[in-house]
Design a protein with these regions (language model features):
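Walker A/P-loop
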Residues: 12-50, 74-78, 144
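Pre-Walker A adenine-sensing motif
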Residues: 2-13
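Substrate-engagement module of ASCE P-loop NTPases
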Residues: 76-78, 104-119
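Conserved nucleotide-binding/hydrolysis micro-motifs of P-loop NTPases
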Residues: 59-61, 90-92, 126-131, 152-155
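Flexible beta-alpha connector loops of hexameric P-loop NTPases
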Residues: 57-68, 91-102, 148-149
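A short helix-turn-beta junction within AAA+ P-loop NTPase domains corresponding to the substrate/partner-engaging
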Residues: 135-152
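Short glycine-rich substrate-engagement loop in P-loop NTPases that contacts/grips substrate
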Residues: 48-79
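Structural recognition of the conserved hydrophobic beta-strand(s) that form the central parallel beta-sheet
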Residues: 85-87, 106-107, 119-126
Length: 155
């Protein structure tokens, strides 16, 4: 990756991450752009594989107490070197007492920090829901460097 090359050449390593939020209505091209971005990041050496792994809440959250972190970590492990695209990311935290969703979010926040040199996570969803989700989650918000807004065609 770029960071590894910088390190090999004795250059300082930046704490830059490429995690981002795609915000917009259905059909505005969020998934298509994420696929293109995954390939571009591979070509740039930011990630090693360049595949887009598309997931939702059910892929990250378990039905059993204590199993969500395991499930989320296993999915992130499989996503190393790729872009992990979490559609309707706000659904991870549906209610204030949603301990399963909170466990998934806490696990993702840790992995976004620890694996940022070979993993890109894109959180996607509708504008109002994503704004609410990110504003109640300072840890998640601090790891997102780019907010890309997708407008319906003709707007």
């Amino acid at each position: 990756t770029i960071q590894q090359e910088r390190q090999r050449n004795g250059m300082p390593i930046s704490n830059l991450s490429y995690h981002c939020a795609f915000i917009g209505s259905p059909g505005t091209g969020k998934t298509t752009v994420a696929r293109i971005l995954a390939k571009a990041y591979k070509l740039l050496g930011i990630i090693t594989n360049g595949d887009l792994i598309e997931v939702g809440r059910s892929d990250l959250v378990s039905a059993y107490l204590g199993q969500t972190a395991i499930k989320t970590n296993e999915l992130v492990d499989k996503s190393i070197g790729n872009v992990l695209f979490i559609d309707e990311a706000y659904s991870l935290f549906e209610r204030k007492d949603d301990s399963y969703g909170k466990e998934a979010i806490d696990t993702l926040i840790t992995r976004m920090e620890n694996d940022r040199n070979n993993l890109v996570i894109i959180l996607a969803g509708y504008e109002k829901e994503m704004t609410d989700f990110l504003s109640t989650n300072p840890g998640m918000m601090s790891r997102i460097n780019r907010y890309i807004h997708f407008q319906p065609e003709g707007m």
